[in-house]
């Protein structure tokens, strides 16, 4: 038995043991309450970073806690394994994406094991495997059959040199291709969409069903969905039998329309453009095509536009207004057209001033008919002017009347619109789930039959980063027969957005090896919704929104019976590292090259800026988790991550605090080992449990009772129990636990004899030192449990355990079984946080079974009751000393005890007491003359 704490060897030992025992296997439904603890699964980049460590440590503590609290726990892990980096590796290094990905998974899985996470690896999924994406494809077909998957033209990022589609992350800040350097263009392609807008209202309303989510996340989702109530209005085009449809939240301003704007990509743009304006319009469209969506909609960027020469009619006043195109109007958003009301919209006002367009006031703050020249847009409500039959009305009233007029006259109708757009899921990439559609010249888009799933990714693929998608180049793979009519047809060559893979993985985990169906609904309905989901705030919108959408669609398809996938959400903060930056050159300097006491650039001597930022390779401020574990062990890394900051706040890395947690674990190790050094295991058991199996056999009690008591002897700690509670109370408690029936009267009688014998042998009051220790223990149980069962304030829970260790270090009853119980309780409280050291000490102390399968300690309020308190004695307000008095003593008793004390006798001798002030439980002050 090594007396020195050696974390690396201990951790390796127990990780091997837990794996061999399959200790973290998910239990079957055994009538225990369930708890589904889930971290957002990682992309297999090959190495864990500290952000991963924080995320998964938080979830692991919760999972371990819930097991100890009597829950059956599902704590799985998998890999969000499709994505662009694997394809880039194939292009740059000639490594097949599958090989690169699977090697990274193997490496990261080993790193996760080294951190001691209690993951059920039998539930592992990887989204890039045919076994998984077969069901991703099947789910796509469920959407297709429900009318929720469709194709339409949409803009993509196009590299004109490499002749290929680029993902947003492949376009730099200047709008250039990451590989060729070409200015990226916008190009229209026919692509697949999911009709998430059909669920917009549900997605918005059901946020109210998520009280366990952070309010800011719900607000972000609500804003992203962006519900707007207004009107759809149509403006006839002069000289054409077509109309321009617009949506507005301010139909009360329609009489102030002075122009209409189309998106450059709008199908009507070419039709309304006059010959005189054709070159101007085409040139402008080409310029806009080179801009990203972010560039076009940036608020700090001047809005640009050109007139088409066409005109539209405002149906409310029959006035002709010019039709423009502008960069800030996007075809994919709303109707792809807006009505310009410069007097009452900030953006329209700026645009009108820039291009000298009319500005017509139709709402004023009062009924003064004030039509003065505006210096800025008036966007508030007010009184209608210059608005025909609505003049003089409140704009809030006129809004409804104008919608009714539009509906009566056929100009439009009331409408609810959402900022949320349908989800573009097509990707012109190889490393993703193939879309299971075959395009037939006769039948159109035909779903691949279920029996032909999965549509597997071909392995012999050339990756150049140029030209069409790699799949589109494989004629043998592309050319197939139509499943419906047998005509020569072609496979869909787009793959799915990787967000689709992560939108349903949490549903696969409970039934991860099912080969017959996407999942067994009975199993999924048992485990879902996820009880605690943990992940970064960066996923607050897309991933979480898409997962909610998927759950609702699959519910409507009869596959599950719950509305929301994640009952509680914890968004952990970032892990930040100390960052050094040269303000002169703008370069980041590796922290290893800097003297923290005098931070200067080692090359130039410039004084460096010092601040904390999210850890990243580019800023040279990252800390490798493997290095920390090699030096201090996984338990220390976990403890630091949990202690340094509340989970929802950003965490600043601090080597000194890492060392502080290492010292704390060393202290716990030393305390237990010192106790064991002075007590043999047999003596410890006799003292700690107070009764042995030999004692029971000698007294000839029933075999059933012997079995039950010895099996649960550690849980009862009978000696300590009967020192604190009456035998009758203990008897009732044990009867309740074993649920004895009336037919077991003999057993109950024997049990009473056992307890009476223990009382006679080990009875007696606890000493003051023992009471103090017991009070410290149960205060820690109370505080740690509340910290973990509430908002998961791990940092304060660790602080409470450190307080308990300090109290035990100062205790004067280290030979007492109460002290032994206290050490055991400390290990139990610490177990979810530092699983390896607690398991080792638990076993060394002679306990049976794993510390992680032991019941969580229960708080006893009686233990906090104080028998005596310290009473301060003052003379004329000056403290002269303290005495111990009964905690429940009344004022008269306190005064009496204070008067009789040696302190009072000494300081009051020969003095007249004018007044006595008694503050219960605090002090007695003698006012003397």
Swiss-Prot record:
Keywords: Aminoacyl-tRNA synthetase, ATP-binding, Cytoplasm, Ligase, Nucleotide-binding, Protein biosynthesis. InterPro entries: aa-tRNA-synth_I_CS, aa-tRNA-synth_Ia, Leu-tRNA-ligase, Leu_tRNA-synth_edit, M/V/L/I-tRNA-synth_anticd-bd, Methionyl/Leucyl_tRNA_Synth, Rossmann-like_a/b/a_fold, tRNAsynth_Ia_anticodon-bd. GO terms for cellular component: cytosol. One of its GO terms (molecular function) is aminoacyl-tRNA deacylase activity. A motif ('KMSKS' region) lies at residues 614-618. One of its GO terms (biological process) is leucyl-tRNA aminoacylation. ATP binds at residue 617. It is found in: Cytoplasm. It holds the Pfam family tRNA-synt_1. Its EC number is 6.1.1.4. A motif ('HIGH' region) lies at residues 42-52. It catalyses: tRNA(Leu) + L-leucine + ATP = L-leucyl-tRNA(Leu) + AMP + diphosphate. Belongs to the class-I aminoacyl-tRNA synthetase family. This is Leucine--tRNA ligase. It comes from Trichodesmium erythraeum (strain IMS101).
């Amino acid at each position: 038995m090594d007396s020195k704490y050696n974390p690396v060897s201990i951790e390796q030992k127990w990780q091997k043991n837990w794996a061999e025992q399959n200790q973290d296997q998910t239990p079957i439904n055994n009538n225990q309450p369930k708890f589904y603890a889930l971290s957002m699964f990682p992309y297999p980049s090959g190495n864990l970073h500290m952000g991963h460590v924080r995320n998964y440590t938080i979830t692991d503590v919760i999972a371990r806690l819930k097991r100890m609290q009597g829950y059956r726990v599902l704590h799985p892990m998998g890999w969000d394994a499709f994505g662009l980096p694997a394809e880039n590796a194939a292009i740059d290094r000639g490594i097949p994406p599958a090989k690169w990905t699977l090697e990274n998974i193997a490496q990261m899985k080993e790193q996760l094991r080294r951190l001691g996470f209690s993951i059920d690896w039998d539930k592992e999924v990887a989204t890039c495997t045919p076994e998984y994406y077969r069901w991703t494809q099947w789910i796509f077909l469920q959407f297709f059959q429900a009318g929720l998957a469709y194709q339409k033209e949409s803009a993509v990022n196009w590299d004109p040199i490499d002749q290929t589609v680029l993902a947003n992350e492949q376009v730099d800040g200047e709008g250039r291709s990451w590989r060729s350097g070409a200015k990226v263009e916008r190009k229209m392609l026919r692509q697949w969409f999911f009709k998430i807008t059909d669920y917009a209202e549900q997605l918005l309303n059901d946020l109210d069903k998520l009280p366990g989510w952070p309010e800011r996340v719900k607000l972000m989702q609500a804003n992203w969905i962006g519900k707007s109530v207004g009107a759809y209005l149509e403006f006839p085009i002069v000289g054409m039998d077509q109309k321009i449809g617009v949506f507005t939240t301010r139909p009360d301003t329609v009489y102030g329309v002075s122009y209409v704007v189309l998106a450059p990509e709008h199908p009507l743009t070419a039709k309304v453009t006059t010959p005189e304006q054709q070159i101007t319009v085409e040139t402008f469209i080409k310029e806009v095509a080179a801009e990203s969506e972010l560039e076009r909609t940036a608020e700090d960027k001047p809005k640009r536009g050109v007139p088409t020469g066409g005109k539209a009619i405002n149906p409310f006043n029959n006035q002709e207004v010019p039709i423009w195109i502008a960069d800030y109007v996007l075809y994919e958003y709303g109707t792809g057209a807006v009505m310009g009301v410069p007097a009452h919209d900030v953006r329209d006002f700026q645009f009108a001033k820039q291009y000298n367009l009319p500005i017509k006031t139709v709402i004023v703050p009062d009924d003064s008919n004030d039509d003065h020249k505006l210096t800025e847009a008036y966007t508030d409500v007010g009184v209608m002017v210059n608005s025909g039959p609505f003049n003089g009305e409140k704009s809030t009233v006129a809004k409804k009347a104008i919608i009714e007029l539009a509906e009566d006259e056929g100009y439009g109708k009331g409408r609810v619109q959402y900022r949320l757009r349908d989800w573009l899921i097509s990707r012109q990439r190889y490393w993703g789930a193939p879309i299971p559609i075959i395009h037939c010249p006769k039948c159109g888009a035909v779903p691949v039959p279920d029996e032909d799933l999965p549509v597997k990714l071909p392995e012999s693929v050339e990756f150049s980063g140029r030209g069409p998608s790699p799949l589109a180049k494989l004629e043998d793979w592309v050319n197939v027969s139509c499943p419906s009519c047998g005509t020569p047809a072609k496979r869909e060559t787009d793959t799915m957005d990787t967000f689709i893979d992560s939108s349903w993985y949490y549903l696969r985990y409970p039934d991860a090896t099912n080969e017959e169906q996407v999942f067994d609904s009975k199993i999924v309905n048992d485990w879902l919704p996820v009880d605690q989901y943990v992940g970064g705030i960066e996923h607050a919108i897309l991933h979480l929104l898409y997962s909610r959408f998927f759950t609702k669609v699959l519910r409507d398809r009869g596959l599950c019976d719950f509305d929301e996938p994640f009952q509680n959400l914890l968004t952990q903060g970032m892990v930040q590292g100390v960052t050094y930056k040269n303000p002169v050159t703008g370069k980041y300097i590796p922290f290893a090259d800097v003297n923290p006491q005098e931070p200067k650039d080692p090359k130039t001597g410039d004084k460096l800026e010092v601040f904390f930022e999210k850890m990243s390779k580019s800023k040279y401020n990252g800390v490798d988790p493997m290095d920390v574990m090699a030096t201090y062990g996984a338990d220390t890394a976990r403890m630091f991550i949990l202690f340094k900051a509340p989970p929802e706040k950003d965490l600043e890395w601090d080597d000194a605090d890492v060392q502080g947690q290492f010292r704390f674990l060393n202290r716990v190790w030393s305390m237990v080992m010192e106790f064991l050094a002075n007590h043999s295991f047999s003596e410890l058991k006799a003292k700690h449990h107070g009764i042995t199996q030999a004692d029971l056999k000698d007294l000839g009690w029933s075999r059933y009772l012997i079995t039950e008591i010895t099996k649960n002897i550690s849980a009862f700690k009978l000696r300590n129990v009967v020192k604190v509670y009456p035998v009758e109370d203990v008897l009732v408690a044990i009867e309740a636990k074993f649920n004895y029936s009336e037919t077991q009267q003999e057993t109950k009688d024997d049990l009473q004899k056992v307890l009476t014998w223990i009382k006679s042998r080990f009875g007696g009051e606890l000493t003051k030192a023992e009471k103090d220790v017991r009070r410290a223990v149960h205060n820690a149980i109370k505080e740690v449990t509340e910290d973990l069962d509430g908002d998961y304030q791990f940092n304060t829970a660790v602080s409470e355990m450190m307080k308990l260790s300090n109290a035990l270090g100062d205790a004067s009853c280290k030979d007492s079984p109460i002290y032994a119980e206290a050490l055991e309780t400390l290990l139990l409280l610490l177990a979810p946080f530092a699983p390896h050291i607690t398991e080792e000490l638990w076993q060394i102390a002679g306990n049976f079974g794993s510390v992680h399968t032991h019941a969580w300690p229960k708080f006893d309020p009686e233990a906090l009751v104080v028998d005596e308190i310290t009473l301060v004695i003052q003379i004329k307000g000056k403290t002269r000393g303290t005495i111990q008095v009964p905690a429940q003593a009344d004022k008269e008793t306190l005064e009496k005890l204070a008067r009789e004390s040696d302190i009072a006798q000494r300081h009051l001798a020969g003095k007249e007491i004018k007044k006595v002030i008694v503050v219960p439980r605090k002090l007695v002050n003698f006012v003397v003359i």
